[in-house]
Amino acid sequence: MDTADIVWVEESVSAITLYAVWLPPRAREYFHALVYFVCRNAAGEGRARFAEVSVTATELRDFYGSADVSVQAVVAAARAATTPAASPLEPLENPTLWRALYACVLAALERQTGPVALFAPLRIGSDPRTGLVVKVERASWGPPAAPRAALLVAEANIDIDPMALAARVAEHPDARLAWARLAAIRDTPQCASAASLTVNITTGTALFAREYQTLAFPPIKKEGAFGDLVEVCEVGLRPRGHPQRVTARVLLPRDYDYFVSAGEKFSAPALVALFRQWHTTVHAAPGALAPVFAFLGPEFEVRGGPVPYFAVLGFPGWPTFTVPATAESARDLVRGAAAAYAALLGAWPAVGARVVLPPRAWPGVASAAAGCLLPAVREAVARWHPATKIIQLLDPPAAVGPVWTARFCFPGLRAQLLAALADLGGSGLADPHGRTGLARLDALVVAAPSEPWAGAVLERLVPDTCNACPALRQLLGGVMAAVCLQIEETASSVKFAVCGGDGGAFWGVFNVDPQDADAASGVIEDARRAIETAVGAVLRANAVRLRHPLCLALEGVYTHAVAWSQAGVWFWNSRDNTDHLGGFPLRGPAYTTAAGVVRDTLRRVLGLTTACVPEEDALTARGLMEDACDRLILDAFNKRLDAEYWSVRVSPFEASDPLPPTAFRGGALLDAEHYWRRVVRVCPGGGESVGVPVDLYPRPLVLPPVDCAHHLREILREIELVFTGVLAGVWGEGGKFVYPFDDKMSFLFA
């Protein structure tokens, strides 16, 4: 339209969500979507604005990652999600479809209206004939708006048949119960209507509280008015493809921009029940287009996910952040979540790597980037394999010392390389959104050294992106391999031998007098600078331009190192007694105690190596190792009744016992099982021990006796592996260290 006809306002946008999706008449290969903006002006007054975007089937498939999706399927799913009374959890059916839908709609929005920035001053232009936003521009009418929080606590008692949960888990044995609960609610939505609910919301200006014995009836207790919390706003619109104007009815938050919910008390079913109640209330009257009611989070995946989040894709229209209630840095975590939300247009972590580029765009970017590299690096890329040992001078078991040893790392190197390679291969992207997405990746890399939230996003974004594109994983792995080769070449010229690592982090020993600390300090610094310079030169020669100057960090200096496996290594500085243990599993409190025993024992054992009779040293070392195991077991005996101490974390990808039927009766406790499951073995009597998920039962725990012997045998196997490696590495012994637990100590736990 003619820009002279646009009506401009100066506002900021605090949230963008999906309102409606439809097929225009006779359309088969594209759909339209209505997007809701929560805006506010310089005075803080809220405004509801809308934009209409068009998305083609090709764009949808690019973001979906395959051709197995159609615009008709997307529209059908979105239409079903507008009736939460019948379909309150539509994204459970296909979370990937909803990720693709949300990502491609946001991409279309920026392509068709201009890049949108959250909480930043903007000029927003609307077409007065349609009431729709058609243009967005950055402005400088004021400082960025500070996001405002409201504290939300919601608890619901949703009566779900334990047999329904058991049926879901029987279909998916690796399922997490947070997903199973939502799946059961999806299958029987009437149980959400009968739920009891308690909610408390505190904003900067209001307190809102409700208590429902059942959501089918009015609350039995109430404090504060709904109007103090939100404003119900109706806006007349004339979207394309509609014969007449439609009315959008939305909520505008008053004096806040997002909800914060304590992680330990957060319950996705409770929040869905609350928002469902609001949706039903607000849209009870006819005359308005019903909005999409859809969410994403680890609970919406069968196997869950390790990081909790709750993404609001549609109604009510603004985000909810979950943070651990006991975290000392809870305030910083909330600020970080809000910053990540603003930086990534509200799409992270809901859409994953799609926040940068659609999955189908990455192979072309990776191929173009690889074509820009020098032949030697291209060869390293072609040879790279995930199982390849990149740096492994010492084959475990091995021990070195006394000799000056150092650990180094390139902080954030993989993320920097990803951004640089994406920029190298993305210059030919036809889609402007591609360049916008790459610019967001750049901004994250630039912010990461000073902003912990950006580093946390990159820690997940890099592997997510590589998982979405094997060619990109190959490229990044090959470039890291080339970095490793340069590290090894440079090390040989600076009295340094690299013993292990992967390029991003590595360690090695120095050819310096073990007694001369000053000389060692100088040589280590010379090596650090030389490697840093050489790796930087290799990357620049391949046109890989990092966003930050390459920095090789010294993580520790030691005098001894013991390696017992590819990942297992212990470093010790006998001068100041500092150490570092890597590769020992810390699956629970008992494992953490065992790690402390291992570290203390290794210090004592390596202190023997100055003696003159190696054979006697080895015998003495075995005695010290057995004594250490004795002490560990005697200490464990004092904790034999402590189920928390013996619990171990199990991921969905690890084999575990079937859940006992009583585990399905935990109610809202099950909502917290997003990914990790803490299991303790117990002896119910009359048979073998079984694994019990301790977090699925109320406190205080009432359980059969803990099978401490089972847990100790698993822990002792890890300790035996370490001690065997020490004996072989230091004294060249070929025999294993085996602690005689069954003969010596098992009677304590009989």
From Swiss-Prot:
What's the reported outcome of changing C612G?
In strain: Nonneuroinvasive mutant HF10
What changing A353V does, per the record, is: In strain: Nonneuroinvasive mutant HF10
- Sorted alphabetically, which InterPro entries does this protein's record hold? HSV_HEPA
**Is this entry keyworded Iron?**
no
One GO biological process term is:
bidirectional double-stranded viral DNA replication
Please state where this protein is localized: Host nucleus
Q: Which cysteines are joined by disulfide bonds?
A: none
User: Which HAMAP family does this UniProt record tie to the protein?
Assistant: HSV_HEPA (MF_04010)
Family assignment? Belongs to the herpesviridae HEPA family.
Name of the protein described by the UniProt record: DNA helicase/primase complex-associated protein
Top-level taxonomy: Viruses, Duplodnaviria, Heunggongvirae, Peploviricota, Herviviricetes
